[in-house]
Regions:
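Boundary/entry segment of secreted carbohydrate-active catalytic domains
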Residues: 2-96
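Aromatic-lined substrate-binding rim segments of carbohydrate-active enzymes
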Residues: 78-164, 233-252
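Conserved, mostly hydrophobic/aromatic
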Residues: 91, 193, 206, 244, ...
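Active-site groove signature of glycoside hydrolases
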Residues: 158-182, 186-227
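Substrate-binding cleft/loops of secretory-pathway carbohydrate-active enzymes
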Residues: 207-308
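Substrate-binding cleft of secreted/luminal carbohydrate-active enzymes
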Residues: 258-262, 270-381
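Extracellular/luminal regions of secreted and cell-surface proteins that mediate adhesion/ECM remodeling
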Residues: 372-493
Length: 493
């Protein structure tokens, strides 16, 4: 897949829209007669923390080192402390393959995985996962021993030099041969995971993972690859992507937009992922402009997960730039520029709730602001009321998005009553409402139902891969504990 500009690029229509609502035009007078000249209700933007599918600050439970081991704390205490960090609405783990499978045909999870999944239900914070096939920051191989018995390892051209006290500079980062055994074991592992977690309440997203360091599709700074040809490399990577896409039918996949440095066809995986309605991520922000173009000009229905470390390797040093700005705050400002749905709460190779709190206490403003803007924050800024010739009432919702990102899927609006006598609605086009502008959509009320009844409420949901998730209305007033909005006239005219 050649490099291309992402602005205006044709990635297809995006996710299917079921029960599409009428979204205009809305002429006020003859011959249209929508009579939307007078506003019935208005809302103002809220500042509450929003926890819903497709967005949020995401606390890292594990990065490259597996279990977050902190002296003086049990593993449960450490993970619980990370879950309790108030700004985080999701968590993330990045285990090595050997941490979840020890033998063929069966998954056996390390304790930190099991604790994380249990606490995700306890705290209502879903989990993003990536299973690494190759990890440069450990000396042992990320692959399980039973896989290594059938899969040769190969050295690529080049070397990676740096501080010899760091593990990544102490070995040669051998790459596995992508033979039939590896592909077969990979498919088995994906199917076993999906059998347990596909569509379950614990999982938010799954990273695609295949060739290279961290499974991101590159082996920088090493040159080339260990495939017979570039064509074979692309075919193998697409095969691994297709295995994941087939297994995870109810969970969005997330592909890193890392440039195709080793010419293995990773760019084709990115393209396929977008066309299939999946999402994107980037694990460094102040880097290649190719990645920045992709993320900032992606289709509105594609979520963007930005990863950045808030501190240095020991978790307590906070680098500043030449102008004196904390590097973490600089990254956050660029995360907003990239219209991010997710951002990592990550203290690099020193994952520890104490380190997370220490950074937050020193630099609270940028994180607080991001928590109130990350992702999408939808509400009906205007609600107009009109009537059909047969007397049935219409509500026209002027939907706005006070966040920084589009809706990564399809937004469904439903007008309902608590007693179930009214339940009617439908969907906006994929990705709407965008962060700027208004998306108008009309819902016709059942015969005999009036907006003035005082019983009507508006509920929002996001549909991702055919699964619906509740979306709280992000308004400053009139919002119920379940996230719905009371439909009550508050505009006189």
């Amino acid at each position: 897949m050649p490099v291309h500009n992402w602005t205006g690029y044709d990635f297809g229509p995006g996710p299917a829209v079921r029960d599409r609502l009428y979204q205009g035009p809305f002429g006020c007078y003859e011959p249209d007669n929508f009579y939307g000249g007078w506003c019935y209700q208005s809302t103002q933007p809220g500042k509450q923390l929003i926890n819903c599918m497709g967005m949020g600050l995401i606390t890292y439970i594990s990065g490259d080192f597996g279990a977050p081991l902190v002296p003086g704390k049990t593993l449960e205490e450490t993970i619980d402390g990370l879950f309790r960090f108030p700004l985080g609405t999701k968590v993330y783990i990045r285990p090595n393959w050997r941490h979840i499978q020890k033998r063929e045909g069966k998954l056996e999870f390390d304790d930190y995985w099991k604790i994380t999944m249990e606490m995700s239900l306890q705290y209502d914070k879903r989990v993003g996962i990536r299973v690494m096939l190759n990890n440069p920051d450990i000396l042992e191989n990320a692959l399980p021993d039973f896989v290594l018995k059938k899969v040769p390892l190969h050295k690529l051209k080049g070397s990676w030099t740096g501080n010899p006290s760091q593990v990544r500079y102490q070995h040669e980062h051998l790459q596995p041969e992508y033979n039939d055994y590896l592909i077969g074991y990979f498919e088995e592992m994906q199917n076993l995971l999906a059998e347990q977690y596909n569509g379950g309440p614990e999982i938010e997203m799954v990273d695609t993972h295949h060739f290279g360091l961290w499974g991101e599709g590159h082996a920088w700074p090493y040159d080339g690859h260990n495939f017979k040809s570039r064509k074979e490399a692309e075919e193998k990577l697409l095969k691994m992507y297709e295995i994941q896409q087939k297994a995870w039918t109810k969970v969005p996949l997330v592909t890193n937009v890392q440039p195709d440095y080793n010419r293995v066809g990773h760019s084709s995986v990115i393209d396929r992922s977008v066309r299939d309605g999946n999402w994107l991520r980037r694990d460094s922000i102040l880097v290649q402009n190719e990645c920045i173009d992709a993320l900032s000009n992606r289709p509105a229905w594609v979520a963007n997960f930005c990863e950045g470390a808030m501190s240095s390797g020991n978790g307590t040093d906070y680098p500043v730039d030449a102008d004196g700005f904390a590097r973490g705050d600089v990254i956050i400002s660029h995360v907003k520029d990239l219209k991010a749905n997710y951002y990592s709460l990550w203290t690099f190779h020193a994952i520890n709730p104490d380190n997370l709190w220490a950074y937050y206490k020193k630099y609270p403003d940028a994180l607080n602001d991001l928590a109130q803007r990350i992702g999408f924050r939808v509400r009906p800024s205007w609600i107009w009321r009109s009537s059909d010739p047969d007397g049935r009432e219409n509500l026209i919702f002027g939907m706005v998005n006070d966040g920084i990102a589009g809706v990564p899927g399809v937004l469904r609006l439903t007008v309902f009553t608590d007693d179930g006598s009214v339940e009617t609605g439908g969907c906006l086009d994929a990705g709407f409402p965008h962060p700027k502008g208004i998306r108008e959509a009309m819902i016709t009320l059942p015969e005999g139902v009036s907006a003035n009844s005082g019983r009507l409420k508006l509920r929002a949901e996001i549909e991702v891969k055919g699964v619906r998730y509740p979306v709280p209305i992000a308004a400053a007033h009139g919002v119920n504990p379940d996230g719905s909005l009371n439909i009550i006239r508050n505009v006189n005219g």
